[in-house]
Curated annotation (Swiss-Prot):
FAD-dependent monooxygenase; part of the gene cluster that mediates the biosynthesis of chrodrimanin B, a meroterpenoid that acts as a potent blocker of insect GABA-gated chloride channels. The first step of the pathway is the biosynthesis of 6-hydroxymellein by the polyketide synthase cdmE. The prenyltransferase cdmH acts as a 6-hydroxymellein 5-farnesyltransferase and produces the hydrophobic metabolite verruculide C. The FAD-dependent monooxygenase cdmI further converts verruculide C into verruculide B. The gene is cdmI. The keyword Flavoprotein applies. Its cofactor is FAD. PANTHER family: FAD-BINDING DOMAIN-CONTAINING PROTEIN-RELATED (PTHR47356:SF2), FAD-DEPENDENT MONOOXYGENASE ASQG-RELATED (PTHR47356). It holds the Pfam family FAD_binding_3. Glycans are attached at residues 156, 198. Compounds in the chrodrimanin family such as chrodrimanin A or verruculide A exhibit strong inhibitory activities against protein tyrosine phosphatase 1B (PTP1B) and therefore, they could potentially be developed into drugs for the treatment of type 2 diabetes or obesity. Furthermore, chrodrimanin B, the end product of the pathway involving chrodrimanin A or verruculide A, does not exhibit the PTP1B inhibitory activity, while it functions as a potent blocker of insect GABA-gated chloride channels. The lineage of its organism: Eukaryota, Fungi, Dikarya, Ascomycota, Pezizomycotina. The chain crosses the membrane at residues 453-473. This is FAD-dependent monooxygenase cdmI. Belongs to the paxM FAD-dependent monooxygenase family. FAD binds at residues 43, 57, 116, 315, 328. GO terms for molecular function: FAD binding; monooxygenase activity. InterPro entries: FAD-bd, FAD/NAD-bd_sf, FAD_mOase_fung.
């Protein structure tokens, strides 16, 4: 086996092995590069940025970190900033708000949608040294030593480092290796993926070419019974769309349905006559498709993110519905906060070039990192979980709230989104961006109450009304 972490005894620098050339993994690579920490990225695919039909939303909290890293200009050149949000209901009613424009004014960054492939290409191409990224390097095991770890790959190579970061997605190998280590070391509770990740919805996502009646900067959400469509009209009129479908039952992680191209076509054809916007049908958008894919949507947040010299970030630790556009942004934040934690552990010590944190030092640091991230992630997970069910009119309460409350909230939607954005991570070891807005301070919830009580109060009120209605109905039926 070829040892590509060779002569580590002579290598004085602390080294991080990042597994996964994902948005989280490549963002972390940029963060480490800026701070001067050595790293290598291992990616199992042959290429970093394949075209899979996926789009990605960059909210101001993700955009701020990318701006600090000098990467947001690439994003901005590829997007049309969102300016208007439109809600469409099955009874023909429509409502409109300028909350995307308000968010940009408050935070200094637009709501941006672009091809996921474009973002990955930018993250990769702008690395100072792309030779640190190794493709065709699928990880099969992580071995532990007293002061380091060794990562073994299918191409018969091994990579040594002092910290392994799993940024390898929902089907994470590093997560399994972390739990294997936790079990053998009796450190923490080994979590069951099947109990932590559930699947209630599927999604067909795709990109379509321009339609003359759809204007760049539109965000359109179509509410329907048991399904919904979220779409964004981007640069040059290209439409990024997500068709969400409630499944016939809830599945566990290991029961996840497998979908084919034919499944996606059948579902889209079945709903093609439904209104998309104004006189445009979903079929009009679907007929202009460039790429599309169907996938189950996992939902869940893991409790244990680290063990010893292993930590996991991004989709390997949390997965939630795309409806609020925070998935990639949370991955970017994870990378930023992990880099902050590493920067603090190095800055807090009298050190020379040979300083390397001990395993207990790293474990304590990673526990603090996890504690800081998990509370924020859980809050956003709850909002996303509510959003997908609200838009798919999942039950009477969701139907009434979506139709008779959401269109009349005015600036409340922008205020809620602002509170979700304002407490996003910022890189502590780099200057804050010059472009900014007052929203970061105004809407910070670090010393305030969260949005959740208000939302729950609305739902509780609806529940009370429904109970009263049910009682009155039963009374009149009996009389």
């Amino acid at each position: 086996m070829q040892n590509l972490g060779a002569s580590m005894d002579n290598n004085k620098k602390f080294k991080v092995v990042i597994v996964g050339g994902s948005i989280a993994g490549l963002t972390l690579a940029h963060c480490l590069s800026k701070f001067g920490i050595d790293y290598v990225v291992l990616e199992k695919r042959r290429e970093i940025a394949p075209q899979e039909g996926a789009s990605v939303g960059i909210m101001p909290n993700g955009g701020r970190v990318l701006e600090q890293l000098g990467l947001f200009d690439d994003v901005e050149r590829a997007i049309e900033p969102l300016s208007v949000a439109q809600l469409v209901y099955p009874d023909g009613f429509c409502s409109e708000s300028e909350y995307p424009k308000k968010l940009c004014e408050r935070f200094g960054f637009p709501l941006a949608f672009l091809d996921r492939q474009m973002l990955l290409e930018s993250l990769y191409a702008n690395l100072p040294d792309i030779t640190r990224v190794k493709t065709n390097s699928a990880v099969i095991a992580v071995e532990h030593e007293d002061d380091r770890v060794r990562v073994l790959t299918t191409d018969n190579c091994s990579y040594e480092g002092h910290l392994v970061v799993g940024a390898d997605g929902i089907h994470s190998t590093i997560r399994k290796e972390m739990w294997r280590a936790a079990s053998s070391l009796h450190q923490g509770q080994v979590e069951d993926t099947n109990s932590m990740m559930n699947i209630t919805y599927a999604c067909v996502y795709g990109i379509s070419s321009a339609h003359p009646l759809l204007k760049p900067g539109q965000q359109i959400t179509c509410f329907n019974d048991g399904w919904s469509i979220l779409s964004v009209v981007g640069k040059n009129g290209r439409t990024f769309w997500f068709l969400f479908l409630k499944l016939e039952r809830e599945y566990k992680y290991n029961e996840a349905p497998k979908y084919t191209k034919e499944d996606a076509i059948a579902n889209c054809d079945r709903l093609s006559a439904h209104t998309f916007w104004d006189t445009v049908t979903f079929g009009d958008v679907w007929s202009r498709r460039e790429v599309f894919t169907m996938t189950p949507l996992e939902e869940g947040v893991f409790e244990q993110w680290s063990c010893g010299r292993i930590v996991c970030i991004g989709d390997s630790m949390h997965k939630f519905a795309p409806n609020i556009g925070q998935g990639a942004n949370c991955a970017i934040e994870d990378a930023g906060e992990l880099a902050n934690a590493l920067a603090r552990i190095f800055n807090d010590r009298e050190k020379g070039d040979g300083f390397k944190p001990s395993t207990p030092d790293l474990s304590n640091m990673l526990e603090q990192f996890q504690g800081k991230r998990i509370s924020r992630i859980k809050a956003l997970y709850k909002v996303a979980r509510l959003a997908i069910r609200l838009q798919a009119r999942d039950g009477l309460a969701m139907t009434l709230m979506g139709r008779y409350v959401m269109p009349y909230l005015g600036d409340k939607v922008a205020d809620w989104a602002s509170r979700d954005i304002a407490d996003g991570a910022i890189l502590e070891f780099l200057p804050p961006p010059e472009r900014s807005g007052s929203g970061w301070q105004k809407y910070s919830q670090k010393s305030k109450k969260s949005n959740t009580p208000f939302i729950l109060a609305v739902l509780a009120g609806l529940g009370f009304l429904l109970t009263m209605f049910k009682q009155q109905w039963e009374y009149h039926q009996d009389s």
